[in-house]
Amino acid sequence: KVSASSQLKEVAIADIIGGMDIVKGELIVEVVNEAMTVRGDADLGAVPISLTWRRNFGDTPVFRSRYQIQGRVEQEQWATSLGFDFAPFTGETIRGPSEAKVTVTEFDDRRREVRAKLDLTETQLLLADLKWIKSQGVPGTAQVDLTMHGDRVRVIDQFTVEAGNLEVRGSAQMES
């Protein structure tokens, strides 16, 4: 049986989640037998987050890594820090901050499952083509569950947006 624990400060890890880096980490690392758990606070790009990362080392784990991330994303950070420089993450659609909870699970076959939940209460949403606006302060949520292979989205298992008087649900299968 093997176990170790350490508290780390000012940690930077390159290319940790989908090619993104974490910096300014204040992390606790625990290793027990064939798994490592990392917990703490860091910046993902310029977005302050709370992170729990589980890494399994065995030969046939159920999953290889799982990242649970929680943070507040300001409107401009979608593009500048997270690389989401496309609709609906642009200033034409989203204005204001969103509270985000994201779980990314990585498997040995290069598959990734992503579940993202956003609290849109403080976010203004604008759908100009539909002449629809959700004002800041009006409750709203968005959720997406998707499956990736490598860096490509293969399946959007489900997505929902419930905000004000708008309710959108769907799924999508991407072509190879």
Q: What is the role of each PLM region?
A:
Residues I13-A116, T123-S176:
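Interface amphipathic segments
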Residues V2-A14, E122-T123:
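Core structural elements
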